[in-house]
């Protein structure tokens, strides 16, 4: 190969010796021997003689048809670290929309330790500024606090102003805040209005201040108190106020009731104390309850358990009234605190339950997925097994052209399937199945390039490459290359569902069944209650539901079967006859059977009398008695029974005897 390359270089040099021009980069790239492409002859052109491939000169090999070329896996392909845009040649991580969205999430939706550090630092700065504002009102620290506060105010105004502009710009990542009107909608939010007021107030304070002092006049001191609104800057999303509002809304009825009754107690206690103490004079000679307003002030201070002690009842009547109403009113004024405390506790418990429930969602989804995969593994559809099939990675090179300049522009293109390719393997987390194949040592080079339709070759002309065939190997993956280097048998990947053997399918079924049991165990662990009180509540709720179901079942049984007759009185039995229950029907059937038994006994007695009358000759005096008994028995029977005349059979001798 080196001699051929040298001759080619010498030939090109002899043609251009007159100009003494150096070979261009294109010519060097064309004539250089490639270590990544090695030609493989077609099956029809293979010969058993070892010298058949060496006898051909470069011209004859150039005239041959195309040969398949296998990529040498000496240099494994490397994945790009940063994903590039599909339509641009740059990273979308640094695009405008991405930066805008990340900034908006960082400022408006803080999550993570970085956001926590930033917002906590802002809170500390605002708190320090508020402390210096308080110190500026003290005469001892007035000078020092004012000088430090001037520079702190300048820094904070610049910081909050810049942050407000950045917030306004980053809000454009959301559809409802796009454009001028969208930004105006964002600026009309309550927290944005507070930020704007804080920035404007700080600018006014700094501009109007004189001699380097922030608080020059009383008007500026009034504006300075607007800086307290900076403390609201910490809670951007208003989660604190939403939580408080939700608790108050849930317990609104209880709060309104307690406040209403407490207010009534305050009014009545203040009025009665005023009536008892309006003429009383203390030791200094002044009236402490000279008006109803003084009595109301005393009532508010008393029922709220503050007790300043500036107004005290002087008479025993007033003290008695005050003590009685205080016990009643204080109890109602203390109830809202307990109601709100219990509401916050229930809210925290509800959030914990929600977190516990959210942990069950992935476990339930995994259980459903694994159970469905176990069910799908039992059928023989090809879609069930496609996820275990690896599509071949194909490399293509453009067809050769007579022009040398165009041949340099040929590049290989990586083509992967989106569903079963290399990129989707990480998301599916499904291993690729390989199988063994036996080839001869002499034919390994050719068989490895055409295993069950596995096409990883690049078709290119031998005349252009013009290199000797060397050791060939598959360009499947880096792990396969290592296995091939170590001398282990090469496993070709499964590229079609038909190549899956029964052992593969059984293995997949076993793995899926194991995954199902693991997912089931995780779901059962996620379903376990996290507190003993929840266990008690769960058991009590289950017991209550069981009792309700038992009562419902008993009601339905009583409605369908009826109550047992042994527990019913005669009057209840008579009332139960008209009902269409199974018990009432059984009672009526029993009565019918008793009646039928009586009728059958009567019929049997009548038949016995008839048989005895036909066989014997009873005494004439007893015959009318017997006939009367039969007639009486017949009369006592139901009207539907046959009469005595129908049952009586006349004898033949009586028929033949003439009438006297």
From Swiss-Prot:
Q: Which Pfam families match?
A: Ion_trans (PF00520), KCNQ_channel (PF03520)
Sequence ranges of Polar residues compositional bias: 1-18
Q: Where are the transmembrane segments?
A: 114-135, 147-169, 186-211, 220-235, 254-276, 316-341
Sequence positions that bind a 1,2-diacyl-sn-glycero-3-phospho-(1D-myo-inositol-4,5-bisphosphate) = 237
Q: Name one GO molecular function term.
A: calmodulin binding
Bilayer topology: Multi-pass membrane protein
Q: How does it assemble?
A: Tetramer. Heterotetramer with KCNE1; targets to the membrane raft. Interacts (via C-terminus) with CALM; forms a heterotetramer in a calcium-independent manner. Interacts with KCNE2; form a heterooligomer complex that targets to the membrane raft and leading to currents with an apparently instantaneous activation, a rapid deactivation process and a linear current-voltage relationship and decreases the amplitude of the outward current.
Instruction: Give the function comment from the record.
Output: Pore-forming subunit of the voltage-gated potassium (Kv) channel involved in the regulation of cardiomyocyte excitability and important in normal development and functions of myocardium, inner ear, stomach and colon. Associates with KCNE beta subunits that modulates current kinetics. Induces a voltage-dependent by rapidly activating and slowly deactivating potassium-selective outward current. Also promotes a delayed voltage activated potassium current showing outward rectification characteristic.
Indicate what this protein is called per its UniProt record.
Potassium voltage-gated channel subfamily KQT member 1
Per the UniProt entry, what species is this protein from, by scientific name?
Squalus acanthias
